[in-house]
């Protein structure tokens, strides 16, 4: 077993060897290096062929038509394209957008930008378990609501929102529905023929593909429309200009094909490791809280708060495992996770949370090592904590008045 142990698969995944092998075929002079948009010679035709195959592979994972897949530089761009693109296209109908407070920053900040452009955005609260109250969502919908954007799987908690029901609600009211599926592709079965979703964002690097490539599903029937955000040569049916990065797209396509092939195997493997991790940590430690809901979440993300331990010192104490507190995009700030705050967790618990994310290459040995390391580290840090001592003595910390110096 090699240290440090990687348990941050929700931040990014290593590229699968099978994927890297395919990508290598599309880079050098004796490989498939042509520009897929070059129509006048074989180099272009061959590149176009593998790009078409990649498009089909991405579409197959979600049961879409390949013509509904628009390649982008990642889920952040896909979210921007869907939300800004749809809001601008449908603005004559209305300027109201609904999203949730626990969305990824790529959705929240895109909505903030639209507010600066005169749109009105409702950021919905979630329940204590991280899920939306669908009745409240229905009550928030108005005649001038043009778009609802709700993520499929939350990147910090792993909870799975009820996309099927939300889709029905939106379709009934003729509201466009966007779903950020960066964390659910390859982990939850997605069938866009069954789901009433208009736009769906995907990322390559969350599914053992390369970074820097993503996709946006844009429904054809009934047709979903959007305004392009990137202008140029009219690539991707005018929705996203820019030379197609053949090796990146082939990487994403292969990753999605492998995800489909290995779905059952990955799910069983990760579910068993999740149980081992949760049982190991939650069984004989007190003041340990599971964030989210265990019965409606993906097995790969486990978010736990350890009371009476400061998050930053905890991360430093467990430097032999690569985990995160909050999401990678915001872990550079010392603010507590806005997602955990939205669940109603107090600052102390939000600060002492750790997200373990398990993946295809995680082993039982690594999980067992992690459990032991967590137990020892938490025990050691709590021994140094005066708050833990007071708690042990039965003092209600909320009733303590601290002296101000």
UniProtKB/Swiss-Prot annotation:
One of its GO terms (biological process) is [2Fe-2S] cluster assembly. Pathway: Cofactor biosynthesis; iron-sulfur cluster biosynthesis. Pyridoxal 5'-phosphate binds at residues 75-76, 155, 183, 203-205, 243. The active site is at 329 (cysteine persulfide intermediate). InterPro entries: Aminotrans_V_dom, Aminotrans_V_PyrdxlP_BS, Cys_deSase_IscS, Cysteine_dSase, PyrdxlP-dep_Trfase, PyrdxlP-dep_Trfase_major, PyrdxlP-dep_Trfase_small. The gene is iscS. The modification N6-(pyridoxal phosphate)lysine is found at residue 206. It catalyses: (sulfur carrier)-H + L-cysteine = (sulfur carrier)-SH + L-alanine. SUPFAM superfamilies: PLP-dependent transferases. Its EC number is 2.8.1.7. This is Cysteine desulfurase IscS. Homodimer. Forms a heterotetramer with IscU, interacts with other sulfur acceptors. Master enzyme that delivers sulfur to a number of partners involved in Fe-S cluster assembly, tRNA modification or cofactor biosynthesis. Catalyzes the removal of elemental sulfur atoms from cysteine to produce alanine. Functions as a sulfur delivery protein for Fe-S cluster synthesis onto IscU, an Fe-S scaffold assembly protein, as well as other S acceptor proteins. It is found in: Cytoplasm. One of its GO terms (molecular function) is 2 iron, 2 sulfur cluster binding.
């Amino acid at each position: 077993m090699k240290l440090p142990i990687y348990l941050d698969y929700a931040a990014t995944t290593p590229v699968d060897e099978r994927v890297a092998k395919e990508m290598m075929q599309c880079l050098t002079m004796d490989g498939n290096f042509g520009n897929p948009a070059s129509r006048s010679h074989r180099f272009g035709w061959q590149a176009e062929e593998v790009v078409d195959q990649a498009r089909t592979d991405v579409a197959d994972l979600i049961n879409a038509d390949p013509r509904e897949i628009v390649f982008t530089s990642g889920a952040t761009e896909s979210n921007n394209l869907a939300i800004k693109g749809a809001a601008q296209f449908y603005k004559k109908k209305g300027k109201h957008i609904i999203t949730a407070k626990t969305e990824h920053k790529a959705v929240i900040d895109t909505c903030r930008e639209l507010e600066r452009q005169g749109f009105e955005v409702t950021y919905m609260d979630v329940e204590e378990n991280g899920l939306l109250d669908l009745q409240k969502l229905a009550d928030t919908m108005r005649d001038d609501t043009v778009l609802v954007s709700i993520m499929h799987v939350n990147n910090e908690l792993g909870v799975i929102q009820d996309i099927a029901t939300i889709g029905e609600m939106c379709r009934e009211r003729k509201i466009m529905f966007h779903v950020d599926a960066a964390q659910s592709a390859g982990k939850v079965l997605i069938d866009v023929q069954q789901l009433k979703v208009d736009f769906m964002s995907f990322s390559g690097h969350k599914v053992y593909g390369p970074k820097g490539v993503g996709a946006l599903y844009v429904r054809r029937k009934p047709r979903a429309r959007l305004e392009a955000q990137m202008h140029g040569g009219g690539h991707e049916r005018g929705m996203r200009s820019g030379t197609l990065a053949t090796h990146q797209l082939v990487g994403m396509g292969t990753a999605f094909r492998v995800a489909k092939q290995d779905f059952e195997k990955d799910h069983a493997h990760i579910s068993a490791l999740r149980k081992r991790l949760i049982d190991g940590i939650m069984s004989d430690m007190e003041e340990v809280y599971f964030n989210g809901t265990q019965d409606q979440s993906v097995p790969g993300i486990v978010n736990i708060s350890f009371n009476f331990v400061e998050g930053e010192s905890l991360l430093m104490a467990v430097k032999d495992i690569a985990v995160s507190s909050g999401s990678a995009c915001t872990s550079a700030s010392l603010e507590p996770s806005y997602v955990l705050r939205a669940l109603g967790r107090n600052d102390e618990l939000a600060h002492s949370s750790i997200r373990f994310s398990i993946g295809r290459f995680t082993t039982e040995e690594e999980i067992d090592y992690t459990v032991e390391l967590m137990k020892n580290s938490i025990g050691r840090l709590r021994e140094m904590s005066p708050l833990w001592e007071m708690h042990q003595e039965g003092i209600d910390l909320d009733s303590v008045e601290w002296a101000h110096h």
